[in-house]
Regions:
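A short, basic N-terminal segment
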Residues: 6, 18, 23-87
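Mid-core helix/loop region of P-loop NTP-binding domains shared across ATPases and GTPases
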Residues: 32-48, 88, 123-125, 133-253, ...
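Post-Walker A helix-loop "phosphate-sensing" segment adjacent to the P-loop in P-loop NTPases
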Residues: 111-121, 152
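Short alpha-helical segments that sit at the start of domains
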Residues: 322-352
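Terminal-proximal interaction/regulatory segments of ATP-powered molecular machines
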Residues: 351-430
């Protein structure tokens, strides 16, 4: 432990030896302005192509949502009965990543509906849970929901059913409509099964004051197909698909945001079009398009140039892919890295389906080389499912007639690169 006196003693020495430092009451050192390092001085003097960069960041809420009028209307239609204290139908929303699902749901429900309810004096509670980030177990989900309705829970000693009951009894304490938005619901279901959905729908029938509606959002298009039939019929009372954006639609989205994000004339002609075309080429992902534009701007600033050029979009694409894959690969546990390395060595590039059995055999050989105990085929199969969810591979189940079913996998292009190989070899010491 460092005592406060020591800190002040050391601060004194530091200030005497380095007079460019001063000390605030809080004890935090700050540099006196005139002694800023050259680098930062120059950085501050340099201009930037951005006027307001955060407009391009993923969590920024835009003030307009082009090309989603149909979906916005459909969500409004489904949730409107809540304003008359009638339970809205459960809604299941699906579409690929970056197609505006989260944005539209938050816009209509947390924004428009909540304001309309306030105005009308109707009690509507809305709870939003991102199952991937905040609750990837059943226990985690009910704890999160209970916390959001203001129920204090002891830190230990409660079972999942206890937490579930505690949440519902608190939620049922006022006459209201409760809308639970379960974003990235497929993550929770893949980890915890669909029992939580069954619990919610069954509990709903027992409540006296509150009526619950669920809005599930998923980018796994086949997600609803895997549900228990009872849960499936209840969750899919209404379904809504968000199609991918095309290049022209992405241009509109980007232009809308670019006008407040960038300084006048700091985007050369063709930049927005190229970002839109690149993002449309993959799967019409608005997040990707916005990232490309933002990173192209950041790279321009780093170079000290005054306008973003078309070529900067290529550099941005390279940087984003490199950063994403590098993070994915290097943060995987060692066993998963070995599985990926085996896939890489069998695949010889992307675009070819390979059998999971072959992967397992090679993986076992690498384990022996690395003096690691191999996981069971079952566990390796779980790792492959995880890779599938992360977009590192694409998996498909094929029937082999009377020999049962087997799974084939294909490495995604962004994982079939020399960079990934090098990162894995470095991480695994191979
Ligand atoms: N029509 C639009 N207008 C303006 N911005 C949009 C539009 N559609 C999407 N975006 C922006 O693109 C990004 C991704 O959108 P969003 O998070 O809603 O996608 P999603 O479908 O929920 O993706 P995921 O399945 O990966 O969660 C966000 O920054 C969002 O603001
Ligand atoms: Mg989302």
């Amino acid at each position: 432990m460092v005592c406060l006196e020591c800190i002040f003693y050391l601060s004194g020495i530091l200030i005497k030896r380095f007079p460019c430092f001063s000390i605030r009451n809080s004890g935090v050192f700050i540099l006196k302005e005139k002694n800023l390092p050259q680098f930062f001085e120059e950085y501050l003097k340099k201009g930037s192509v951005f006027k307001e960069k955060r407009v391009l960041q993923a969590n920024h809420f835009p003030n307009d949502i082009p090309h989603r009028a149909v979906q916005i209307h459909q969500v409004r239609v489904v949730v409107a009965p809540a304003l008359r204290l009638e339970r809205p139908s459960n809604l299941f929303i699906y579409g690929k990543t970056g197609t505006g699902k989260t944005l539209v749901v938050k816009w209509v429900i947390n924004g428009e509906l909540v304001s309309a309810a306030k105005k009308a004096g109707v009690s509507i509670q809305t709870l939003y849970v991102n199952c991937k980030l905040d609750a990837d177990t059943e226990y985690g989900l009910f704890t999160e929901l209970a916390t959001q309705v203001g129920k204090e829970l002891p830190l230990t000693g409660l079972s999942t059913d206890d937490v579930c009951s505690a949440f519902f009894s608190k939620a049922d304490s006022t006459k209201s409509i409760l809308i639970i938005i379960l974003d990235e619901i497929d993550y929770l279901m893949k980890k915890a099964g669909d029992d939580f959905l069954y619990k919610i729908t069954r509990k709903n029938e027992e409540l006296k004051n509150t009526q619950v509606a669920i809005i599930g959002i998923s980018n796994d298009l086949m997600f609803a197909e895997h549900l228990d039939p009872r849960v499936k019929s209840s969750l899919s009372e209404e379904k809504l698909l968000f199609p991918p954006y095309n290049a022209i639609e992405l241009q509109d989205i980007l232009n809308n945001r670019a006008s407040s994000a960038f300084k006048h004339s700091s985007l050369e002609p063709g930049v927005v079009e190229k970002c839109a075309a690149y993002a449309a080429r993959e799967h019409g992902d608005a997040r990707r398009a916005l990232d490309l534009l933002r990173v192209a701007g950041e790279l321009t600033d780093r170079k000290g140039a005054t306008s973003v050029a078309v070529a900067d979009v290529d550099s941005a694409e390279e940087k984003i892919d490199h950063d994403t894959v590098a993070e994915l690969v290097t943060t995987q546990p060692r066993q998963a890295q070995l599985v990926l390395y085996s896939i890489l060595n069998i695949s010889h590039g992307a675009g070819k389906f390979i059998f999971t059995g072959e992967v397992y055999e090679l993986y076992k050989k690498y384990c022996a080389k690395a003096s690691l105990r191999p996981l069971t085929q079952r566990r390796v199969s779980d790792i492959l499912s995880e890779f599938d969810m992360l977009g590192i591979i694409t998996a498909r189940v094929i029937s082999k007639g009377r020999y049962g079913r087997t799974r084939e996998i294909m490495l995604a292009p962004q994982a079939a690169t020399p960079v990934v190989r090098r990162l894995l070899e470095e991480a695994l010491n191979l």
